[in-house]
């Protein structure tokens, strides 16, 4: 076995370990929340799970961060309106007209619980996560409105492509407020429209605010299991995508203005995001942390629109969009620039996007994500064949030099400097690059990392079956068959390589496949499938290069002879 192959395997292993360590530090897991005890108020009633934020006069926009929220009980059933479409199950609280629950019926929590949908938004105090919106007055104070609706239940029926939920109410200052949510078939974007009628005798000034309020999930550490980013993020024309971790929000609140943009809360595969209605206007983005004694803090992120001026007897309208659903690039890209970056493909994002595009194109034909991974991997290996062949031939030439290098070692003995000079002179004379076997292989490492992120982060692979016992490519093989096959594929590569006379390298030939097999046991099945395919194709390529090496060397020698004659 060639020492350069050992070095390459070690580098790949270290890169993989570094990836895991980085994810464990930055994106800790989300365990189940611990229960809390509800405390009644003085009159025996439980306060609501939240109230609209208290805005105070600020700088330019006269708006500032959110105020306090009551967090001890859920919204009473009597105040809830339910909305059901083909992709969303939503609950709206008539006090404020906020969305306090959102479930995704097309995304079950697990293959074992297919009837239980993933829930993004929740009004439960222990896992508070709601999408709020409302109006502020000229002083930046929120206007609390008790809304009414024509029905308690709204359902998008067969044949309907649009569902409108209209809420009406009167604000304390006399404004007639109409809040309208519009849902569309096969769409996770919810369009929000506010209409304000000023029936008073005085002009009214105010703004629209939208925000996401979420209690931070408790954190604990797991090893060798990938977790994605969980926290806030925002985008603007200046910075298309910016992560705002809970730790960073603890240290400093958001307080900035931006034309258009968006703000979101992310978790693995899913997110919620508010997008301003008019990309030409400038909005004020803010955040606020609400300390909770003995419990995780609550985080508020949102934006406020420019101020509206409504004369007496006049009316005005404003709007925004709420997205609650899976992180699917084509859906997010159409809502706001940079929102698709919430698919956390890491620092090799452009390469990952290209690989996912290829993967999706293959899937459109074969209709199976497992076979798509195999075919895409084969295509990648074909593209990089020149680099692989160059690496294999370089290693073959280095093996040919081993007897001459051994002779140099015997000649120079313990004189390491003389041995080094003689070895480099031999390489120069034979026109051999000592790193020629490693560099072409290392060029492929970024593609491996990018494909790693594609398989880990793409919601399309969540609960995607392959064949036989592999029912979910996004989790580990339950029977560890794929990691064992991967280890065997590595052994096949080693057997194809000439055996080294060095006993240490011979041991490494057997140890490395075992180490990698154990290391990959908890990797998602899709990633192990990629690695198996990569090994098999590379083994076939190496076999072909070795078989044609002598003829290739003869052709190269003849070509050099012709050049010398010229």
UniProtKB/Swiss-Prot annotation:
<feature type="transmembrane region" description="Helical">
    <location>
        <begin position="436"/>
        <end position="456"/>
    </location>
</feature>
<dbReference type="InterPro" id="IPR028053">
    <property type="entry name" value="Membr_insert_YidC_N"/>
</dbReference>
<dbReference type="InterPro" id="IPR001708">
    <property type="entry name" value="YidC/ALB3/OXA1/COX18"/>
</dbReference>
<dbReference type="GO" id="GO:0015031">
    <property type="term" value="P:protein transport"/>
</dbReference>
<dbReference type="GO" id="GO:0032977">
    <property type="term" value="F:membrane insertase activity"/>
</dbReference>
<comment type="similarity">
    <text>Belongs to the OXA1/ALB3/YidC family. Type 1 subfamily.</text>
</comment>
<dbReference type="Pfam" id="PF14849">
    <property type="entry name" value="YidC_periplas"/>
</dbReference>
<feature type="transmembrane region" description="Helical">
    <location>
        <begin position="346"/>
        <end position="366"/>
    </location>
</feature>
<dbReference type="GO" id="GO:0005886">
    <property type="term" value="C:plasma membrane"/>
</dbReference>
<keyword id="KW-0653">Protein transport</keyword>
<keyword id="KW-1133">Transmembrane helix</keyword>
<dbReference type="GO" id="GO:0051205">
    <property type="term" value="P:protein insertion into membrane"/>
</dbReference>
<keyword id="KW-0143">Chaperone</keyword>
<comment type="subunit">
    <text>Interacts with the Sec translocase complex via SecD. Specifically interacts with transmembrane segments of nascent integral membrane proteins during membrane integration.</text>
</comment>
<feature type="transmembrane region" description="Helical">
    <location>
        <begin position="509"/>
        <end position="529"/>
    </location>
</feature>
<dbReference type="Pfam" id="PF02096">
    <property type="entry name" value="60KD_IMP"/>
</dbReference>
<dbReference type="InterPro" id="IPR028055">
    <property type="entry name" value="YidC/Oxa/ALB_C"/>
</dbReference>
<keyword id="KW-1003">Cell membrane</keyword>
<keyword id="KW-0997">Cell inner membrane</keyword>
<dbReference type="InterPro" id="IPR019998">
    <property type="entry name" value="Membr_insert_YidC"/>
</dbReference>
<keyword id="KW-0813">Transport</keyword>
<dbReference type="InterPro" id="IPR047196">
    <property type="entry name" value="YidC_ALB_C"/>
</dbReference>
<feature type="transmembrane region" description="Helical">
    <location>
        <begin position="3"/>
        <end position="23"/>
    </location>
</feature>
<protein>
    <recommendedName>
        <fullName>Membrane protein insertase YidC</fullName>
    </recommendedName>
</protein>
<keyword id="KW-0472">Membrane</keyword>
<keyword id="KW-0812">Transmembrane</keyword>
<feature type="transmembrane region" description="Helical">
    <location>
        <begin position="369"/>
        <end position="389"/>
    </location>
</feature>
<comment type="function">
    <text>Required for the insertion and/or proper folding and/or complex formation of integral membrane proteins into the membrane. Involved in integration of membrane proteins that insert both dependently and independently of the Sec translocase complex, as well as at least some lipoproteins. Aids folding of multispanning membrane proteins.</text>
</comment>
<dbReference type="InterPro" id="IPR038221">
    <property type="entry name" value="YidC_periplasmic_sf"/>
</dbReference>
């Amino acid at each position: 076995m060639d020492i350069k192959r050992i070095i390459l395997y070690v580098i790949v292993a270290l890169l993989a370990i570094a990836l895991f360590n980085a994810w464990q530090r930055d994106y800790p897991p989300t365990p189940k929340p611990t229960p809390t005890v509800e405390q009644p108020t003085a009159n025996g009633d439980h306060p609501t799970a939240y109230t609209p934020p208290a805005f105070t006069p600020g700088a330019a926009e006269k708006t500032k961060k959110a105020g306090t929220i009551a967090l001890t009980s859920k919204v009473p059933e009597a105040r809830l309106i339910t909305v059901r479409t083909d992709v969303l199950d939503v609950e709206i609280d008539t006090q404020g007209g906020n969305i306090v629950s959102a479930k995704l019926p097309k995304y079950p929590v697990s293959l074992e619980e297919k009837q239980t949908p993933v829930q993004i938004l929740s009004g439960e105090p222990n896992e508070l996560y709601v999408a709020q919106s409302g109006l502020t007055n000229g002083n930046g104070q929120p206007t609390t409105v008790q809304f009414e609706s024509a029905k308690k239940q709204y359902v998008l029926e067969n044949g309907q492509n649009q569902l409108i939920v209209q809420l009406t109410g009167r604000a304390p200052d006399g404004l007639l407020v109409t809040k309208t949510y519009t849902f569309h078939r096969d769409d996770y974007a919810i369009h929000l429209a506010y209409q304000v009628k000023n029936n008073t005798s005085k002009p009214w000034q105010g703004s629209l605010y939208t925000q996401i309020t979420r209690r931070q999930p408790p954190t604990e550490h797991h090893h060798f299991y990938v977790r994605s980013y969980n926290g806030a993020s925002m985008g603007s024309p200046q910075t298309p995508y910016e992560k705002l971790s809970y730790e960073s929000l603890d240290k400093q609140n958001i307080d900035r203005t931006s034309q258009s943009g968006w703000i979101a809360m992310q978790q693995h595969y899913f997110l919620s995001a508010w997008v301003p209605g008019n990309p030409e206007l400038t909005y004020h983005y803010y955040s606020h942390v609400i300390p909770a004694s003995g419990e995780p803090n609550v985080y508020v992120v949102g934006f406020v629109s420019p101020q509206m001026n409504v004369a007496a007897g006049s009316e005005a309208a404003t709007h925004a969009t709420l997205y609650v659903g899976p992180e699917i690039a084509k859906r997010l890209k159409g809502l706001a620039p940079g929102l698709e970056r919430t698919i956390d493909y890491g620092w090799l994002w452009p390469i990952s996007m290209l690989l996912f595009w290829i993967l999706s194109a293959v899937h459109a034909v074969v209709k199976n994500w497992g076979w798509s991974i195999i075919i895409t991997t084969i295509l990648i290996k074909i593209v990089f064949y020149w680099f692989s062949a160059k690496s294999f031939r370089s290693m073959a030439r280095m093996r040919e030099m081993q007897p001459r290098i051994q002779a140099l070692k015997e000649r120079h003995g313990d004189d390491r400097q003389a041995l080094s000079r003689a070895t480099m002179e031999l390489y120069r004379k034979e026109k051999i690059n000592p790193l020629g076997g490693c560099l072409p292989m290392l060029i492929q490492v970024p593609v491996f990392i990018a494909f790693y992120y594609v398989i880990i982060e793409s919601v399309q692979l969540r609960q995607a079956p392959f064949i036989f016992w592999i029912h979910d490519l996004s989790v580990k093989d339950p029977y560890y068959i794929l990691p064992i096959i991967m280890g065997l594929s590595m052994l096949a590569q080693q057997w194809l390589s000439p055996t080294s006379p060095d006993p240490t390298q011979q041991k490494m030939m057997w140890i490395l496949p075992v180490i990698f097999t154990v290391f990959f046991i908890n990797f998602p099945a899709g990633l192990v499938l990629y690695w198996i395919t990569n090994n098999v194709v590379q083994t076939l390529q190496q076999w072909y290069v070795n078989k044609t090496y002598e003829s290739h060397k003869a052709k190269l020698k003849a070509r050099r002879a012709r050049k010398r004659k010229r």
